[in-house]
């Protein structure tokens, strides 16, 4: 589905955050390694939703919403957020790394498209992308058996 309006993109961002939070909750329930880190990602996801919604509701108007600021294909950022029973821990963590890359790409692409029309929403997207980008490092440390 191609998203054109800010509200569509915000709603999709919310779904990415909530879906990936569920993935990390499930991952922490299945494996003993890195539980604290994974649950911290869940909390951060909830904060990300609040941050994005604040930026959106703080600047949105009918004039901005009426124009089509985006041309984002949601299928390009689709996530598989379920973990099959018996999945090897390293495979699940590698999937988490891929998921983070996809979500960061979404936020950076959306920020770039929205930049000319509004400042606060792209700034929030870039901030969330930066936080999520750091997760890749933490996940890779978990893969090597090191603590963050």
Task: Show the residue positions of the predicted features.
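Acidic/histidine-rich alpha-helical segments that form the ligand environment
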Residues: 20, 26-27, 76-116
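Alpha-helical transition-metal enzyme core signature, strongest for iron centers
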Residues: 13-24, 38-56, 100-103, 125-139
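The feature marks the first
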Residues: 1-26, 30
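Charge-rich amphipathic alpha-helical interaction elements
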Residues: 119, 126, 134, 141-148
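Carboxylate-rich helix-loop segments that flank metal/cofactor sites and access channels
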Residues: 54-89
């Amino acid at each position: 589905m191609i998203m054109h309006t800010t509200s569509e993109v915000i709603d999709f961002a919310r779904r990415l955050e909530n879906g990936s939070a569920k993935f990390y909750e499930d991952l922490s329930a299945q494996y003993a390694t890195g539980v604290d880190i994974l649950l911290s990602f869940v909390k951060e996801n909830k904060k990300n939703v609040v941050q994005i919604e604040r930026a959106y509701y703080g600047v949105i108007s009918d004039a901005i919403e009426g124009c089509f600021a985006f041309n984002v294909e949601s299928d390009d950022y689709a996530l598989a957020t379920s973990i099959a029973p018996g999945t090897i821990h390293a495979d699940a963590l590698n999937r988490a790394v891929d998921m983070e890359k996809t979500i960061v790409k979404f936020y950076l692409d959306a920020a770039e498209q929205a930049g000319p029309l509004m400042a606060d929403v792209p700034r929030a997207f870039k901030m969330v992308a930066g936080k999520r980008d750091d997760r890749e490092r933490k996940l890779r440390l978990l893969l090597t058996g090191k603590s963050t």
